[in-house]
Amino acid sequence: RLSREAATWMSALPTQIRFQMGGKSLAVVHGAPSSVNQFIFPSTPVEPKLSEISATGCDGIICGHSGLPFTQIIDGLLWHNAGAIGLPANDGTRRTWFSVITPDEQGLRFEHLPLEYDAEGASDEMLAVGLPNEYANALTSGWWDNCDILPDEETKQQGIPLSFESTYWSSLRHTAE
C-alpha cells in the first residue's frame, strides 16, 4: 500500500524518459509510448511495435507492464521488456526478472537476469496487508491466476521456465549470444 505522499510523488513522474547510450537513443515507458497501460508481448505483431518506436523518434523502447521479459530487434530498432521485479513471469518458477544493459563503443548488450527472493515471506506480507490472494499465490507458485491479458502464444507457454541469451544491438549488426 502506498502512502498519500508516495502516490503524489509517483503521479508527478514523467510517462517517458529518453536517454542516449552506446550510440542509441532510447525511450523508457511503462507499457507503450501511446499508453502506460498497453500490453505489448513477444507475439504482438511487428507493426504496432514499429509504430510506437517511430512515434518516440528514438531507436528503441525499454518497457515493462506485460510482466514477460523479452528483447526483439526489428528492422534495426529495439523493443526490450525488462520483465517484472515484483511478479514471476508465469513460467512456473518463483523467479522475477530484471535487465542489465551494458554499453560499449559499438552498441548495447541486453541481459535478462532472474532474481531469486523469499517468495514465501513476500507472499505472507502481501496477505497480511490484505492484498489479493491471487497475487500472493502467484509469488509462490510462479503461475498467474488469470491469463485473460495474454495472447494465445504466451498463454501456451504458461509454466515453461524462461531462459535467455544476451542480445547485442549495434548499428552494424545484432546477435543473440
Model-derived features: where do they sit?
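Conserved catalytic scaffold of divalent metal-dependent phosphoesterases
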Residues: R1-G60
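Positions that flank functional sites
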Residues: S25, L68, S141
